[in-house]
């Protein structure tokens, strides 16, 4: 935004006291006129003249208002209005909701309207959003104002503000108002860097990125034994059970053997997250249209390309990690990292650090596509059959994310096995040769070695990531 925008104000400072008289004055209506307006709105929903509203009437009324799906909260609105929980909303309950909501909306309207001229100017809205931790550019601000400003005069009156949010049953904070269509689901199962949703519009994006990175590091460390077990099983040609492999790892290195390679796995988080985020932000305007909205397919494309770039950049670390996890201990000791890296460079050349990159990149877009499709489907199913049209909360979203992530990982798992075997093999085996060797020697079963520990780590990895991320946000004052 231009430097002429007002500075050093506190637009979120609350007025001393807000009464219904303030609301009437702002709306330029009398108490009787307001009563008629509220009664008309109630009658609009009560089109059967029952004298009360049920959930079906509220849902039907919202649908006839042509409110976009992301703004529909029929179940929540019904629950908030039904104060005595008798399954129906009478006029007095409906009126009490409207009274409380209009007072709440006027309170935040006054907090944004620092000039106190009865309307919100774009620069006032911009400053309030920034104070709330939301950073938007001129085009996004113009679209936001245009959405609320019904008479298109460039400012927002309280009447327009009220009409936009009157049927929004949740707390009307600025962050809720701007982000209530966004859903956060942070899932890290140790395969690729996770970028927190909504981060690109947050002024403290670097701190959010740090919080996500630290959460991923803690999660990967906690699930490192399962990761080591998975990799060891993936490279074994002969059938080997989980328990014999666990005993083998214990015999070689005792407890620390289960954490071999975890240091590199954690070190990958920061550069991979940073590269993926920066690449994603650069690709968005190239893929998006004039309105800046890239849509679901655009997000999938931009995310896939950003993920491929990040994966390529940190791939040598991933290969060395695999070699470290799969090589045999010498004299009961794990090989030194620097010696292992040097041996690869000297014996196999620099190209060896990119063995298995192609199958790794091949799996990125299918994994993301399956993950996204499954997540949205599960969320819709939970909304329909479990929550009765209420928006799913963090726990449901986390469960949907874990399930979709596990499904996506399972579908592309054969590519992951081929990649791991190519990484661990010092010979110049191509992807096609590795596929043929596995199919010929082990059949389809060979492509799913290590799948069990991979799936077992999904729940703890995702849960730990989510808990640590939320705790970090709280400690960094990012909520």
Curated annotation (Swiss-Prot):
The keyword Ribonucleoprotein appears for this protein: no
Regulation: Counter-exchange transport activity is saturable and inhibited by pyridoxal-5'-phosphate, EDTA and EGTA. Activated by calcium Ca(2+) and manganese Mn(2+) ions, and slightly by iron Fe(2+) and zinc Zn(2+) ions. Repressed by copper ions Cu(2+) and slightly by magnesium Mg(2+) ions. Magnesium Mg(2+) ions promotes slightly ATP uptake, ATP-Mg(2+) being exchanged with ATP(4-).
PROSITE patterns: EF_HAND_1, EF_HAND_2, SOLCAR
Residues covered by the EF-hand domain: 33-68, 69-104, 105-135, 136-171
Signal peptide as annotated in the record: none
Stretches assigned to the Mitochondrial matrix side: 227-260, 318-355, 416-449
Inducing or repressing factors: By stress conditions.
A Pfam entry, by short name: EF-hand_7
Solcar repeat start and end residues: 203-286, 294-381, 392-475
Tissues expressed in: Expressed in flowers, leaves, stems, roots and seedlings, mostly in seedlings.
Residues the entry annotates as binding Ca(2+) 1: 82, 84, 86, 88, 93
Binding residue positions for Ca(2+) 2: 149, 151, 153, 155, 160
Top-rank lineage group of the source organism: Eukaryota
Residue intervals on the Mitochondrial intermembrane side: 1-208, 281-303, 376-397, 470-479
Alphabetized UniProt keyword annotations: Calcium, Membrane, Metal-binding, Mitochondrion, Mitochondrion inner membrane, Repeat, Transmembrane, Transmembrane helix, Transport
Job of this protein: Calcium-dependent mitochondrial carrier protein that catalyzes the import of ATP co-transported with metal divalent cations across the mitochondrial inner membrane in exchange for phosphate (Pi). Can transport phosphate, AMP, ADP, ATP, adenosine 5'-phosphosulfate, sulfate and thiosulfate, and, to a lesser extent, other nucleotides. Binds calcium ions Ca(2+). Also mediates calcium uptake.
Family membership noted in the UniProt record: Belongs to the mitochondrial carrier (TC 2.A.29) family.
Name of the molecule in the record: Calcium-dependent mitochondrial ATP-magnesium/phosphate carrier protein 3
Organism: Arabidopsis thaliana
The encoding gene: APC3
């Amino acid at each position: 935004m231009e430097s002429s925008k007002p500075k050093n104000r506190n637009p979120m400072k609350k007025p001393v006291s807000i009464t219904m008289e303030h609301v009437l004055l702002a709306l330029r209506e009398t108490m009787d006129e307001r009563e008629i307006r509220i009664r008309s709105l109630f009658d609009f929903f009560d089109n059967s003249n029952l004298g009360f509203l049920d959930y079906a009437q509220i849902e039907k009324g919202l649908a006839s208002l042509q409110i976009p799906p992301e703004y529909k909260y029929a179940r929540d609105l019904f629950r908030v209005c039904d104060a005595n929980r008798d399954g129906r909303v009478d006029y007095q309950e409906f009126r009490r909701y409207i009274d409380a909501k209009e007072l709440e909306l006027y309170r935040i309207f006054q907090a944004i309207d620092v000039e106190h001229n009865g309307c919100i100017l774009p620069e006032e809205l911009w400053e309030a959003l920034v104070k709330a931790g939301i950073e938007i550019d001129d085009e996004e601000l113009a679209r936001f104002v245009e959405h609320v400003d019904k008479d298109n005069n460039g400012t927002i009156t309280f009447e327009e503000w009220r009409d936009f949010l009157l049927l929004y049953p949740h707390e009307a904070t600025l962050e809720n108002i701007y982000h209530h269509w966004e859903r956060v689901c942070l899932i890290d199962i140790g395969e690729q860097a996770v970028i927190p949703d909504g981060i690109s519009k947050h002024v403290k994006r670097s701190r959010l990125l740090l919080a996500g990175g630290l959460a991923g590091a803690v999660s990967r460390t906690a699930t490192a034994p399962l990761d080591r077990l998975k990799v060891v099983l993936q490279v074994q040609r002969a059938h080997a059970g989980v328990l014999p492999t666990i005993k083998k790892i214990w015999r070689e290195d005792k407890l620390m053997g289960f954490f071999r390679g975890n240091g590199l796995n954690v070190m990958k988080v920061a550069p991979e997250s940073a590269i993926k985020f920066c690449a994603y932000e650069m690709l968005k305007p190239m893929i998006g249209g004039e309105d800046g909205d890239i849509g679901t397919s655009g997000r999938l494309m931009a995310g896939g390309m950003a993920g491929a770039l990040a994966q390529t950049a940190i791939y040598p670390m991933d290969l060395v990690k695999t070699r470290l996890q799969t090589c045999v201990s010498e004299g009961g000791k794990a090989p030194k990292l620097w010696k292992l890296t040097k041996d690869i460079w000297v014996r196999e050349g620099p190209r060896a650090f990119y063995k298995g990159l192609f199958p790794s990149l091949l799996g990125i877009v299918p994994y993301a596509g399956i993950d996204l499709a499954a997540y949205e489907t599960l969320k819709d199913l939970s909304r329909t059959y479990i929550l009765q049209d209420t928006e799913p909360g963090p726990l449901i979203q986390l469960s949907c994310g874990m399930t979709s992530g596990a499904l996506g990982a399972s579908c592309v798992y054969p590519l992951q096995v081929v990649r791991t075997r190519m990484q661990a093999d010092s010979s110049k085996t191509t992807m096609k040769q590795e596929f043929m060797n596995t199919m010929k020697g082990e059949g389809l079963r060979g492509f799913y070695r290590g799948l069990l520990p991979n799936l077992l780590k999904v729940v703890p990895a995702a849960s730990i990531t989510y808990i640590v991320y939320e705790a970090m946000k709280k400690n960094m004052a990012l909520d």
